[in-house]
């Protein structure tokens, strides 16, 4: 394994690095990038029991009973069908460990709810730091989309955690979401997709206010795909994570993060020029609202928009 560069943060890796976004925004590929070093291990699925409203947030707010939480843990979060495939903790957590962790949680919860939730999370996920052939790691990278939106809960349970928000052009993210749902459930249309995306961005912005200063980073997926900006982005991510941007991270970025693989500009597919212009007008209105309201990722989104517009103008001239 190549040695890490000497540019790592002085305080070193975080025990927990949460990577989130709106959904369809590049969270998974950035989480994989962050874990491409000897200090972190990637939790290979979105676990979601700590971010869904039926999970830790609702449980600790008193809106969800322990019984209902345990039922969902043993059902959907263990082995759930979503978007044409089975997902859930069963993909990497041995059943014996799962059952033991739930039993321990059940016994602790009534005495100290927050401690029980924290320990359940660690009992289930922390063992990935010692599994595999790469030796023991210092921390985990967890990639459930809502980790930043649910930071009021997670930052309280895990004060040692750091949070990354990956922002993507809302036209691409929302088009991907509409396509993923196959127009069967909301959001079904491009307009609904932008509405869905804007609400998610605002929830992330609100949630991020609960994160301690110095423990939150926002990055643009588009910047990882652009020559020049990609070097700055990987250095920023590595520094924030407390590691060096070593050869494994750089190789992964070169191989897996490019405009083609990221489907940059996918929102144009299947739309006639007039329909594309309509989507663009609606998106500009969304961007202007976000900028007016001081949403912190708005400059990242504006930069991606202007870059895509410039590239479109160049294609038209050519």
Regions found by a protein language model. Name each.
Residues 1-17, 178-181, 205-209, 218, ...:
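PAPS-dependent sulfotransferases, especially Golgi type II membrane carbohydrate sulfotransferases
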Residues 103-109, 113-117, 122, 126-248, ...:
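PAPS-dependent sulfotransferase catalytic domain
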Residues 41-44, 217:
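Conserved catalytic segments around the Walker B and adjacent sensor/switch elements
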Residues 21-22:
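P-loop (Walker A) phosphate-binding loop of NTP-binding proteins
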Residues 43-46, 247-249:
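Catalytic beta-strand/loop signature of glycosyltransferases that borders the donor
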Residues 44-140:
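PAPS-dependent sulfation machinery
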Residues 28-40:
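A conserved segment at the C-terminal end of the G1
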Residues 38-39, 159, 212, 284:
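Proline-centered flexible-loop/turn and helix-kink motifs
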């Amino acid at each position: 394994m190549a040695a890490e560069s000497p540019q790592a943060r002085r305080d070193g890796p975080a025990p927990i690095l949460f990577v989130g976004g709106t959904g369809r925004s590049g969270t998974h590929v950035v989480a994989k990038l962050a874990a491409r070093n000897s200090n972190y291990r990637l939790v290979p699925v979105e676990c979601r029991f700590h971010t869904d409203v039926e999970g830790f947030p609702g449980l600790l707010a008193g809106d969800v009973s322990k019984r209902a939480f345990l039922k969902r843990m043993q059902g959907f979060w263990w082995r759930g069908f979503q978007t044409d495939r089975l997902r859930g903790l069963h993909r990497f957590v041995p059943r014996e460990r799962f059952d033991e962790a739930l039993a321990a949680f059940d016994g602790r919860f009534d005495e100290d709810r927050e401690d029980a939730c924290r320990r359940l999370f660690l009992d289930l996920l922390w063992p990935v730091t010692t599994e595999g052939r790469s030796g023991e790691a210092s921390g985990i990278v967890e990639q459930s989309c809502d980790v930043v939106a649910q930071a009021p809960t997670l930052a309280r349970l895990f004060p040692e955690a750091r949070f990354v928000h990956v922002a993507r052009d809302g036209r691409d993210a929302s088009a991907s979401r509409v396509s993923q749902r196959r127009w069967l459930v909301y959001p079904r249309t491009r307009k609904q997709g932008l509405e869905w995306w804007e609400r998610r961005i605002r929830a992330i912005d609100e949630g991020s206010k609960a994160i301690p200063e110095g423990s939150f980073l926002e990055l643009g997926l588009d910047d990882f795909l652009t020559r020049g900006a990609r070097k700055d982005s990987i250095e920023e991510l590595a520094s924030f994570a407390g590691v060096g941007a070593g050869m494994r991270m750089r190789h992964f970025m070169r191989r897996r993060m490019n405009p083609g693989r990221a489907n940059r500009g996918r929102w144009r597919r299947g739309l006639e020029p007039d329909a594309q212009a309509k989507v663009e007008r609606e998106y500009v209105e969304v961007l202007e609202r976000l900028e007016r309201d001081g949403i912190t990722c708005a400059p990242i989104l504006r930069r991606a928009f202007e870059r895509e517009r410039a590239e479109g103008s160049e294609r038209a001239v050519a």
